[in-house]
Amino acid sequence: MLLSVKSPSLILVRAFAVVICFLSLLPTRDGRSFAVSIDPADVATFAAAAEQNAKLKSDLTWTFCAKRQRGWILYTPLIQRLLNTNAAPETNAFAQALADWQSSAGLPSTGVLDQQTWMKMVAVFQSRRIKDRSTPPPGALTRVSASEFFDPERPEDLRYVERQAYAAYKRLVAAVTADLSLDSNENWLKIISAFRSPAYQAQLRKQSPKSGRASLAVNSPHFTGRALDLYVGGEPVSTDDRNRAIQVNTKVYQWLVKNAGLYGFYPYFYEPWHWEYCPQYSVE
């Protein structure tokens, strides 16, 4: 989408470019000129990209698991983590960081988060998930106290976690509690669901036949005991966009996005509460 000549944003871009050129001519105290490396053409390019991103973040249409989706704003924290930026999607800085990432990913470096770029990002997110979903031997699982679950009355046979994943989870909870000064009496990061047997997963799918594989997979990572659903706010496991908007804006979720990889946990991008223990993936 090209900006019109009368666009206020283009007028500001041109004014900024003039200021840049003027500053480059000013002497410093030691008599040298300022070294300004910003290309006015790049400034204009990223301004145009930022204008498109401001619309696409809510309007981009795409499909995931046979379900039509709209926009990528719910995934902003994950995108910012991938791009290594804190810039908001509608800014020039975000567009520039995106262009750099696009170049490294073999995509046209437009700075626009269009469908091609977004689906590439989805592929990256999905690549950091559990591949082998075999059920572990009983000795590899540990039974967790009911007090560590969101539902303290959860049946004993549904309170198992793979041992190494549980140890990493405890370290993660200790870190986030210290960093964010969380109240230990609240439900933040309590376990909603962990190990599920194939038989129990089939039972859940039978109870919710319209849930789809995005929510209740036939070959679930929960079979491994290394996938944990954790409480990050709102309704615990609702994929309603309004609920996910609440979840992705909590300080706990945003901390996880930035730091969970240090403890071996990586997200399922579509469900803010779902984290998988995959220590084999390096933190980027």
Give residue spans per PLM region.
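Cell-envelope/ECM-targeting effectors and their regulatory/trafficking segments
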Residues: 2-183, 261
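Charged, often glycine-rich, active-site loop that binds/positions anionic groups
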Residues: 198-213
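Catalytic cores and adjacent binding grooves of peptidoglycan-active enzymes
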Residues: 211-284
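Short, solvent-exposed loop/turn and secondary-structure capping segments
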Residues: 110, 132-133, 203-207, 242-243
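Acidic helix/loop microenvironments that form the catalytic cleft of cell-wall polysaccharide enzymes
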Residues: 90-103, 199, 269-283
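Membrane-proximal structural modules of membrane-associated proteins and complexes
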Residues: 171-176, 192, 200, 221
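A mature extracytoplasmic/lumenal domain signature
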Residues: 113, 117, 125, 193-195, ...
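Surface-exposed patches in mature extracellular/periplasmic domains of secreted proteins
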Residues: 108-113, 177-194, 215-219, 264-272
